[in-house]
């Protein structure tokens, strides 16, 4: 066997259908689009159109609203905090707050504060100062010998 003798497996490649290349090709002239009409023109698909059936976006009712005053917290898991401590990006001996998490690259932006969740394990004894935390997260932090200070009651 030589490199110039290597072929694809049978059925691995398929010849593409060349549309609009003369009537002898079998898919010339209208190129499989039928005759005239909206769907024969370029930009064929009509988004959300279901053939005259009432489309789903009109069948389903409107619901809810966007609260412009809603607080948006950045979620951080205990596992991410532990990984940052292990990588020596976070100093566990100092108080860890939103600014420290941002400097360590754990979060990108602070938004309305940081909320800590209990995903992952925490072995380091850390002192956290965050906007909120879940109850299991608080338990895990205290079990590891750390402490947590909540800055706002809204994120609980």
Swiss-Prot record:
| Gly residues composition-biased segments | 21-35
Name assigned to this protein: Large ribosomal subunit protein uL15
Q: Name one GO molecular function term.
A: rRNA binding
Q: What does this protein do?
A: Binds to the 23S rRNA.
Q: Which gene encodes it?
A: rplO
Record's GO cellular component terms: cytosolic large ribosomal subunit
Which Pfam families does this UniProt record tie to the protein? Ribosomal_L27A
Question: Quaternary state and partners of this protein?
Answer: Part of the 50S ribosomal subunit.
Q: Which top-rank group of organisms is this from?
A: Bacteria
Q: Name one GO biological process term.
A: translation
Specify residue ranges for compositional bias: Basic and acidic residues. Answer: 1-13
Origin organism is Sinorhizobium medicae (strain WSM419)
Q: Which family does it belong to?
A: Belongs to the universal ribosomal protein uL15 family.
Is Ribonucleoprotein there in the keyword field?
Answer: yes
């Amino acid at each position: 066997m030589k490199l110039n003798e290597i072929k694809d497996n049978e059925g691995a490649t398929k010849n593409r259908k060349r549309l609009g290349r003369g009537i002898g090709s079998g898919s010339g002239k209208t190129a499989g689009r039928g005759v005239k009409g909206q769907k024969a023109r370029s930009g064929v698909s009509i988004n959300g159109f279901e053939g005259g059936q009432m489309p789903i976006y009109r069948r389903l009712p409107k619901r809810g609203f966007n609260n412009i005053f809603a607080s948006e917290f950045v979620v951080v898991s205990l596992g991410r905090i532990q990984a940052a401590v292990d990588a020596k990006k976070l100093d566990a001996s100092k108080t860890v707050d939103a600014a420290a998490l941002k400097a360590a690259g754990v979060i990108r932006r602070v938004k309305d504060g940081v909320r800590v969740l209990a995903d992952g394990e925490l072995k380091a004894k850390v002192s956290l100062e965050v906007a909120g935390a879940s109850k299991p997260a608080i338990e895990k932090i205290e079990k590891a010998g750390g402490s947590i200070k909540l800055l706002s009651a809204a994120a609980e």
